[in-house]
Regions:
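Intracellular loop-helix junctions on the cytosolic face of multi-pass helical membrane proteins
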Residues: 1-7, 131-139, 164-387, 410, ...
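Hydrophobic core of transmembrane alpha-helices in multi-pass small-molecule transporters
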Residues: 17, 99-120, 453-486
């Protein structure tokens, strides 16, 4: 899996891990911040969230076009600097009016910086495999690169949660997902008697505040201010992670400097060095059209996947906050301690290394690491309290954990199928991924039956008498991850492989532009989050995923011609 890969892959993957850690720390709490700080309802928060995600994934198209002219490395470095300024702006607490426009400016800068950084870094990874010595390892490389992204993402919700708990605890408050919305109702004078009594009861019991004796309106203001400030400082974590990414990038630059230029520069450099290993592909106009058409068809399909997948920061977070039990017990506690998850990931990789090792020394080392990982996970687990409270953003650590943990199994499966000549093509994997994404929302739909609508629950927080088990969302994320592993790294690899050489940056940007459209469409379910039953909301996503799968299978012959 890791053998015979160019060293530049690991350097670029680590640089991306740092940047993604900061980004996913922000995403884990962004919609919660919008509702806590500004009192936005789900529809308003959905509009801002989806527009931001659209910018994040659309601007790589512009970044790719610029990189095709000026070079990939220059755009990556510029992107890091621009993102840093954006996250810094978002991390500074301010009053409501200033905070709103400061946030808009920050989101614009983060989107622009990501547009320059994200796609071009992935093009550089793909360019490493234009060398004939590594060309056969392209799919594996993108799976490893994708895994590295998710290592950063796995720790992000824990970082955000730690900051929230620390800041609120310092101010004498305890987080409760029901309170921000009700606090704004109290401030506006629209809170129902049931919600007012609920908050007063929680204050009197000490469940959400320590020794608070003031009136409810003052409490609401102070609670919102404390929570909002904790989110600001959570965004500041992204600044630190970008500094780490920059250090890794510049310190390891010698390992990938040969792929920093645009495609024309790279070919000229290879010719000057008489490097016969670099693949210089010349396409006829007809072949170019066929490839671009195939890519556009794939782009159409992935729109619907990302619309379904990126509910994680929106409706799935709402579901975690409003409909899911906020206390965990038993074995489920393991999933909400990121260090236990990390030890399990290490255990999986060490076991793979053990069975793949060719020497007794390597087997011994892998075996020792596996044993220590098991001991580490066990020692943490047995020290956990019998039950503890979880925050909604913590559910977002499951998807990246599953990606990291399942990637070796995915690579092993497709490697075995490849050796027997039965490995599905990238387009076929994408189609299967759409079917599995539909299955994930079928699971969530069944678990949501009989629950009150979001609008009814907002009016009376006591209506939900039997919240969903955390395992329902964990299972949903697991099935979505199976879909993601079939679609995302394979799609990126497909673009890298099929894109005409002179259009690589633009085509990778096209992939992200399609993702942007899907992310903008995320708000559809967010805006429907109100009077519609939950099963109807999930049913919309099921239907769209199934339609996309049918479309993909209908175009399969055309797509497989260019593979």
């Amino acid at each position: 899996m890791f053998e015979n890969q160019p060293k530049g892959l690991f350097a670029l993957a680590l640089a991306n891990t740092g940047e993604r850690f900061g980004y996913y720390t922000m995403i884990a709490i962004f919609t919660l911040f919008l509702q806590a700080k500004f009192g936005f309802d789900e529809g308003q928060a959905s509009g801002i969230y989806s527009a931001f995600l659209a910018g994040i994934y659309f601007l790589p198209l512009i970044g790719g076009i610029l990189a095709d002219k000026f070079g990939y490395g220059k755009m990556v470095v510029t992107g890091l600097a621009v993102m840093f300024i954006g996250y810094l702006l978002l991390a500074i607490p301010a009053n409501d009016n200033v905070a709103y426009w400061s946030m808009i400016g920050a989101l614009a800068l983060i989107s622009l910086g990501t547009g320059l950084f994200k796609g071009n870094l992935q093009v550089m990874v793909g360019n490493l495999y234009d060398d004939k010595r590594y060309a056969s390892k392209r799919d594996t490389a993108f799976s490893l690169f994708y895994m590295a992204i998710n290592i950063g993402a796995m720790f992000a919700p824990t970082a955000a949660t730690a900051m929230t708990n620390w800041m609120m605890g310092r101010d004498g408050f305890v987080y409760d997902g029901r309170i921000p919305s009700i606090a704004h109702q109290i401030i506006d004078g629209t809170a129902s008697q049931a919600n007012t009594d609920l908050v007063q009861g929680l204050i009197n019991s000490g469940a959400i505040a320590t020794n608070y004796t003031g009136d409810l309106v003052t409490f609401a203001h102070q609670y919102i201010e404390s929570l909002s400030r904790s989110y600001n400082y959570g965004f500041g974590i992204a600044c630190l992670s970008l500094i780490l990414s920059a250090v890794i990038y510049f310190s390891c630059r010698r390992l990938f400097k040969h792929v920093e230029g645009n495609s024309k520069q790279m070919v000229e450099d290879a010719k000057a060095a008489n490097n016969a290993n670099v693949i210089e592909e010349e396409l006829t106009p007809q072949e170019t059209r066929q490839r671009v058409t195939a890519l556009i068809l794939v782009f159409i399909v992935v729109i619907f996947f990302w619309m379904a997948f990126h509910q994680n920061g929106l409706t799935l977070t709402y579901f975690a906050r409003d409909y899911t039990a906020s206390t965990v017990t038993g074995a489920t506690r393991m999933g909400f301690n990121v260090w236990i998850l990390a030890f399990f990931a290490i255990l999986i990789y060490s076991l793979f290394s053990f069975f793949q090792a060719k020497t007794s020394k390597s087997k011994t080392i892998a075996g020792v690491v596996a044993a220590l990982s098991l001991v580490g996970a066990g020692s943490i687990y047995f020290e956990l309290p019998n039950s503890f409270t979880i925050l909604p953003q913590q559910f977002q650590q499951f998807n990246p954990f599953f990606v990291v943990a399942l990637t070796p199994f995915s690579l092993l499966l497709f490697s075995a199928l490849g050796r027997s000549g039965k490995e599905p093509t990238a387009p076929r994997k994408i189609a299967y991924g759409m079917l599995i994404a539909a299955l994930a929302y079928c699971l969530l739909s069944v678990g949501s039956m009989g629950m009150p609508t979001p609008a009814a629950l907002s009016a009376d927080a006591n209506l939900l008498t039997n919240p969903a088990s955390p395992n329902l969302l964990i299972g949903t994320y697991l099935v979505l991850t199976f879909a993601e592993l079939l679609l995302s790294p394979m799609g990126i690899s497909f673009v890298s492989k099929v894109a005409p050489p002179k259009l690589k940056g633009a085509m990778m940007g096209g992939w992200f532009a399609a993702t942007a459209i899907g992310n903008y469409a995320v708000q559809i379910t967010g805006r429907l989050w109100g009077d519609l039953p939950l099963t109807a909301i999930w049913g919309i996503l099921i239907g769209l995923c199934l339609l996309a799968a049918v479309f993909m299978f209908s175009m399969m012959k055309r797509l497989e011609k260019v593979c």
